[in-house]
Design a protein with these regions (language model features):
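Glycosyltransferase donor-sugar binding loop
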Residues: 31-37, 180, 207-221, 239-240
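Conserved donor-binding/catalytic core segment of Leloir-type glycosyltransferases
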Residues: 169-187, 193-196, 208-214
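Nucleotide-activated donor-binding/catalytic signature segment of Leloir-type glycosyltransferases, i.e.
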Residues: 221-241
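Aromatic "clamp/platform" in nucleotide-sugar-dependent glycosyltransferases that forms part
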Residues: 261
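Short hydrophobic beta-strand element within catalytic cores of glycosyltransferases
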Residues: 278-281
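Conserved acidic donor-binding segment of nucleotide-sugar-dependent glycosyltransferases
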Residues: 293, 297-304, 313-318
Length: 357
């Protein structure tokens, strides 16, 4: 499992499992940190340090399986690059020792990465042989349907509940828009700035707050872009925030923006829903399971045009914002708290899963 740092959706969920009283009291667990990146910007890079660390991870895993007999070996597997090579070696190692891999897919890309490569498809199929699989949503099963024909356990993410009443303020003027995520191009921060430039030119009032750690986009670039677009008096750059400071951002926001082509589920959407903040996001991965059916606004296309329309729609429709706030808050409470997540995972590990597809 990958643990923080760096902080991203997978490492956060793995940390929840590692610290779960329910899981650790019910099962005897050993944990090995599979993370090889030092920070968000390091995730997609290869280095000598990563190779050495990977050898240590494989050696430690070898020793653990040599000296223990596990019912499941839980691996959060990634579909791309060196991360997949490392993860696939671990899967094969588990099978070599006659133990059962349990692969938890937090991202998609297996289909896209193998559609034009027979070798990759064959290797994916080989890796996914004789394993159990967990997906975040039934909507994500299609990504592996060409390489895996077995049953899939469905386990949506859940986050700790820190807000117990819907405190959404629908009387803001101007309305505060929030982006709170790592500064990664695929998460749509540049798309947001382009859409807000258009709205600003039309005289539509708003405040936009940017919160998050640098990734493949750096804050100096964001600052220059904001000046170029004439948004200096509309945009507030805050950098990364955590804990209570982060929760205050949600509490004081009117609309949350995540026009991502990157996320399969979006933990940060759950954080916004916990505060009843209406969300705008992409119609990809498992995101429709969160904010579909009137619990948010889904963009059919990840484009400046669609994002501009979605933002304008929420900015100008107070009743819609209120309805979304009520629905999203209630849906989070009913489905996505950390207690619900831990219970569902416990049921999977006990052989009594809540949902199999």
């Amino acid at each position: 499992m990958q643990f923080p740092p760096p902080i991203h959706g997978v490492s956060v969920m793995n940390d929840i499992i590692r610290n779960s009283t329910l899981i650790n009291s019910k099962f005897q667990c050993d944990y090995i940190n599979l993370a090889t990146a030092k920070n968000i910007d390091d995730l997609q890079k290869n280095s000598f340090f990563k190779y050495i660390l990977t050898l240590k991870i494989i050696s430690k895993s070898f020793y653990k399986m040599l000296t223990n007999r596990y019912e499941y070996v839980y691996i959060t597997i990634f579909p791309f690059g060196f991360s997949f090579i490392k993860d696939s070696i671990l899967v094969l190692l588990v099978r070599f020792f006659g133990q059962q891999p349990l692969l938890h897919l937090h991202t998609y890309g297996f289909r896209e990465n193998s559609i034009y490569s027979k070798f990759k498809k064959k290797y994916y199929t080989f890796v996914f042989k004789n394993v159990n699989v967990i997906c975040l949503s039934p909507l994500l099963i299609e990504d592996i349907s060409h390489i895996y024909k077995g049953q899939v356990f469905i386990l949506p993410n859940g986050i700790p509940q820190v807000n117990f009443n819907n405190t959404y303020n629908n009387e803001q003027n101007p309305i505060t828009l929030l982006y709170l995520s790592n500064l990664i191009k695929g998460k749509g921060i540049l798309l947001i700035i382009d859409a807000l430039e258009r709205l600003n030119r039309k005289g539509i009032n708003f405040i936009f707050r940017i919160v998050g750690s640098e990734g493949d986009i750096k804050y100096p670039h964001i600052t220059e872009l904001i000046k170029l677009k004439g948004l200096e008096d509309k945009v507030i750059i805050l950098g990364p925030k955590f804990g209570d400071d982060k929760y205050e951002e949600f509490k004081n926001s009117g609309i949350f923006l995540l026009p991502s082509n990157y996320d399969t589920f979006g933990l940060v959407l759950l954080e916004a829903m916990q505060y009843g903040v209406p969300c705008i996001s992409s119609n990809i991965g498992g995101i429709p399971d969160l904010i579909g059916d009137g619990r948010g606004v889904l963009m059919e296309n990840i484009s400046v045009d669609d994002l501009e329309l979605a933002i304008n729609k929420l900015l100008t429709d107070k009743l819609l914002r209120q309805n979304i706030s009520h629905k999203s808050f209630d849906y989070y409470i009913s489905n996505f708290t950390v207690n619900i997540f831990e219970s569902r995972l416990s049921n999977i590990l006990s052989g009594n899963p809540d949902l199999i597809v």
